[in-house]
């Protein structure tokens, strides 16, 4: 251990210094590979997220890039708005019945419906479930938490996969919900393969692109599509939903009443007709909404786990320390987002810090690393931003909420379960819907 450098494993360094983040997670002009030991924990060897080689990853990412570009996300706004409208209907019903809504599950259902529609052309219809299929969300959380364990004890994954299914179901009934996820992904992926090779990508789904004639045959197998489907469903659901539920919780805390009022005032002035659907590009222009979202992304963190990278063809220099080529190096988003030298009083929810920084010409946005950075940055960053902007714009104009048996401890990062998780016993952000404004 030397200052901010920690040899976190015998083969990996962790550097706690936000100014060095862009060096570890460099852009496409500099080669960065993933650590092979890390990607094995995904147990999805054919998915893009498991590709260690920089060049191969670049080719594979190129197949999907256009589906997540700003232009493509703008075109899919009707899909996002459709999911938000269905969620709004459920909130309206809750207002009438007095039902308590688990917003973690509700937002996860919304984002899952969006990504399944975008990826396969048909929605998973999670919003139609009575409890938003919360058991599915819990199963996903459990699956991702197990990756942290498998990272340190990789042999356990092989042992678990060898256990007969009936025994697994007795040991953990949640396995049944995981199998439902696998069944959905497998069915949709196999249907895509059975439709045959797609000649053109335009107007098609993500998985049509992966089954395109330009893709080598050995990469168009059902296994490739199934692995990619698992990762897209997980990545396209949890982090965005967590950011939204975290945002709602902070806005509804009594000490943040002025923040809530300021946000509602800005939204009502910008979009006075609640029956209209503002566009993402319009919502992005609102300074206070943007500040609120930046602060929520900072405090929800995205992935909480380490994401090691290697620079196979160059050595790195951090201050006086030389880091040999091919050494796995990582930095967690939590330490960047909670750095008091960048964000004073980092535990405090304070959107005004972004307003002040903007007026002073400071670019704090460079320190939002919820989606990582560089050539391996989250592919769905544009879709995530669109979902967050559009969902908050709609529900905060049309509904009044009250927290129900929920505190800041239900959103504050307490432990690493691959995604950041709250303290033991937390069941998420729960609300009562007090008023509907349309």
Curated annotation (Swiss-Prot):
Keywords attached to this entry: Heme, Iron, Metal-binding, Monooxygenase, Oxidoreductase
The protein's enzyme class: oxidoreductase
Top-level taxonomic group: Eukaryota
GO biological process annotation, one example: mycotoxin biosynthetic process
TM annotation in the entry: none
Pfam families: p450 (PF00067)
SUPFAM superfamilies linked to this entry: Cytochrome P450
Gene3D superfamilies: Cytochrome P450
E.C. code: 1.-.-.-
GO molecular function (one): oxidoreductase activity, acting on paired donors, with incorporation or reduction of molecular oxygen
Cofactor(s) of this protein: heme
Knockout mutant characteristics: Completely abolishes the production of peniphenone D, penilactone D, penilactone A and penilactone B; but still retains the production of clavatol, hydroxyclavatol, crustosic acid and terrestric acid.
Binding annotation for heme: 378
Family matches, as InterPro entries: Cyt_P450, Cyt_P450_CS, Cyt_P450_E_grp-I, Cyt_P450_sf, Cytochrome_P450_monoxygenase
Pathway participation: Secondary metabolite biosynthesis
Primary role: Cytochrome P450 monooxygenase; part of the cla gene cluster that produces clavatol and ortho-quinone methide. The clavatol biosynthesis cluster cla and the terrestric acid cluster tra are both involved in the production of peniphenones and penilactones. The non-reducing PKS claF is responsible for the formation of clavatol from successive condensations of 3 malonyl-CoA units, presumably with a simple acetyl-CoA starter unit, and 2 methylation steps.
Entry-linked PANTHER family: CYTOCHROME P450, N-ACETYLTRYPTOPHAN 6-HYDROXYLASE IVOC-RELATED
Family of the protein in this entry: Belongs to the cytochrome P450 family.
Protein's name according to its UniProt entry: Cytochrome P450 monooxygenase claJ
Annotated source species: Penicillium crustosum (Blue mold fungus)
Gene transcribed to yield this protein: claJ
């Amino acid at each position: 251990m030397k200052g901010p450098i920690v040899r976190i494993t015998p083969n990996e360094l962790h550097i706690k210094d936000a100014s060095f983040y862009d060096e570890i997670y460099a852009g496409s002009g500099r080669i960065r590979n993933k650590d092979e030991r890390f990607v094995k924990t995904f147990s999805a060897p054919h998915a893009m997220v498991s590709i260690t080689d920089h060049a191969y990853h670049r080719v594979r990412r190129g197949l999907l890039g256009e589906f997540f570009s700003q232009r493509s996300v703008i075109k899919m706004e009707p899909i996002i708005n459709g999911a938000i409208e269905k969620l709004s209907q459920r909130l309206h019903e809750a207002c009438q019945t007095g039902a308590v809504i688990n917003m973690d599950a509700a937002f996860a259902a919304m984002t899952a419906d969006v990504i399944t529609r975008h990826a396969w052309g048909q929605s998973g219809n999670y919003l139609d479930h009575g409890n938003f299929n919360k058991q599915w969300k819990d199963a996903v959380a459990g699956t991702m938490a197990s990756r942290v364990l498998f990272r340190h004890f990789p042999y356990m994954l092989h042992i678990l996969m060898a256990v007969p299914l009936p025994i697994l179901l007795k040991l953990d009934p949640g396995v049944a919900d995981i199998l439902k996820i696998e069944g959905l992904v497998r069915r949709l992926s196999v249907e895509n393969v059975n439709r045959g090779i797609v000649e053109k990508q335009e107007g098609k789904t993500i998985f049509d692109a992966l089954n395109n004639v330009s893709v080598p045959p050995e990469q168009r197998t059902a296994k490739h599509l199934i692995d990619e489907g698992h990762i897209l469903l997980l990545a396209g659901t949890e982090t965005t939903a967590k950011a939204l539920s975290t945002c709602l919780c902070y806005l509804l805390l009594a000490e943040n009443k002025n923040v809530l009022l300021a946000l509602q005032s800005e939204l009502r002035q910008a979009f006075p007709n609640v029956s209209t659907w503002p566009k993402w590009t319009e919502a992005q222009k609102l300074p206070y909404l943007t500040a609120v979202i930046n602060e929520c992304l900072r405090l929800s963190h995205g992935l909480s786990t380490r994401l090691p990278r290697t620079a196979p063809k160059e050595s790195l220099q951090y201050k006086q320390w030389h880091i040999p080529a091919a050494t796995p190096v990582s930095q967690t988003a939590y330490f960047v987002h909670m750095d008091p030298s960048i964000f004073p009083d980092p535990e405090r929810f304070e959107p005004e810090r972004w307003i002040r920084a903007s007026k002073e010409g400071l670019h704090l946005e460079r320190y939002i690393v919820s989606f990582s950075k560089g050539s391996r940055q989250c592919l769905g960053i544009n879709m995530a931003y669109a979902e967050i902007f559009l969902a908050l714009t709609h529900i905060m104009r049309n509904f009044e909420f009250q927290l129900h048996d929920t505190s800041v401890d239900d959103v504050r990062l307490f432990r690493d379960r691959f995604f950041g998780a709250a303290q033991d016993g937390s069941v998420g952000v729960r609300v009562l819907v007090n008023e509907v404004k349309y």
